[in-house]
Amino acid sequence: MFELFYHPIYTYGIDERSRFPRERYQLTKKALDESRHKIQFIEPQIIEMEDIYIAHDKTYVDAFINGTLCEKQKRKIGLQPWNDQIIDRTRYILGGSLGAVESVINSNGISANMAGGTHHAHYSEGSGYCIFNDIAICAKKAMRDYEHINNILIIDLDVHQGNG
């Protein structure tokens, strides 16, 4: 069975005035619920702060969590205007990506996070609708926590930015 990590905050964690197409998560969930595909939806755990720090500058992470990013940093990320759910949304997305990786490694073989792929964030800044880089966090955590994982290959085929 295909495991898909999903949380409603993926949609409502983005302000309804944002130009980001936030409805795509709930619409995808609805379409999959109505399909014949055997999908198990799993609600992710919120990521621990220590797991974010393994791939991002602590000063940047703390500024985001404490709501002290400057307007220039927020504009570079996008998703504006931000609402009061953006921090939890971000942490649930990262938790969903980690959950999918752990599921694949430990048993299932196939899993995904509906809002994962936030790979345009850099070490000390966000970019392109990505606050933190879930791909980097997952790769670093997998190599740290699973001794049989020594190498990870990430291929970014995005057309739009090429900075993943």
Tell where the protein language model's regions lie, with residue ranges.
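HDAC/HDAC-like amidohydrolase catalytic core signature
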Residues: 1-155, 159-164
